[in-house]
Amino acid sequence: MKGLLEHEPLQKYTTLKVGGPARYLCAVSDISQVQQARDFARQQNVPVVVLGHGSNVFFSEAGFDGLVILNEMKQRAYDTSSNGVTRATFGSGEDFDEIVAETVSRGLWGLENLSHIPGTVGATPVQNVGAYGVEVSDLIDSVSAVDLETGKEKVFTTRECQFAYRDSYFKTDEGRNWF
């Protein structure tokens, strides 16, 4: 697998700068690379953890005996319909605070109360981040994901995401394997 690192210190990838080595580490920037990483982990029979910017994440100094997938899925797309409604699509590896700032600079309102929340776009629906009376679930139409167990791709509706206060389907035992 291209770009695979072995025994990579995880402290380089967390905001708290702690963590021993990952047995394997790779970065992914598209769905085909996610599938390749998934296949590699299955061949090696090792667990997988997905890492965004490493905020609010602790790794043991003993490290992680598995594959760490760095989420570098970048996409920023805006589509304005004839009735003036803009639909935005963002890659899960995008910096969430940068996205908030960009939408505000474009005059697209809704996310501004969520400014300065650390992490990536992909982490926001998992935790259903919120502040000052706004939750990200108020603004999400759908979430596209890949099941790291089966390789199945799915687009989740907001109902399927089962959003609740700082919670979602993606935090459940059944939903944890979705990237």
Where are the language model's segments positioned?
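Long, positively charged amphipathic alpha-helical accessory segments at protein N-termini or as interdomain linkers
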Residues: 154-179
